[in-house]
């Protein structure tokens, strides 16, 4: 029985480790990120929590896949000024909306919510840039989604 418990704990730990983002953190790459293209803004999307590590849906901006909701990971998308919907879908689609201005940086936090069968990822636009930058600091840059 003890051996079975140890095996289960090790398997669970492996899933958590494999499912988490790895690579350079926002703090490490911030200075080397390309500048925001002229006339565009940048949307950063990040997930700080390990809770629900196995739940990693694709994240969309205006129905275009831009990344994946990996624990402790972030990605960004440069877009023209305008109104945008950021969404993630598991059993249900959760979304939040934002308006982007030229040169502006907006931050969207991906929160984990309980669900009937699986957890849900719910995007939440962060009210101010300082909070977003503070929360994203230890998240790792994710590769582009294929």
Placement of each model-derived feature along the sequence:
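Short loop/turn and low-complexity linker motifs enriched in small/turn-promoting residues
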Residues: 20-146
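Sec-dependent bacterial lipoprotein signal peptides
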Residues: 1-20
């Amino acid at each position: 029985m003890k051996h079975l418990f140890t095996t289960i704990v090790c398997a669970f730990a492996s899933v958590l480790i494999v499912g988490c983002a790895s690579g350079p953190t926002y703090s490490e790459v911030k200075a080397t990120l390309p500048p925001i293209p002229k006339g565009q803004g940048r949307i950063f999307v990040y997930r700080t929590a390990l809770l629900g590590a196995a739940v990693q849906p694709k994240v969309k901006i205006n129905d275009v896949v831009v990344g994946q909701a990996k624990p402790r990971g972030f990605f960004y998308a440069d877009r023209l000024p305008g109104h945008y919907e950021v969404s993630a879908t598991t059993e249900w689609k959760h979304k939040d909306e934002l308006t982007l201005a030229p040169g502006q940086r907006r931050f969207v936090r991906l929160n984990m919510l309980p669900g009937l069968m699986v957890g849900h990822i719910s995007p939440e636009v962060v009210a101010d840039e300082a909070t977003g930058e503070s929360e994203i600091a230890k998240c790792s840059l994710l590769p582009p989604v294929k």
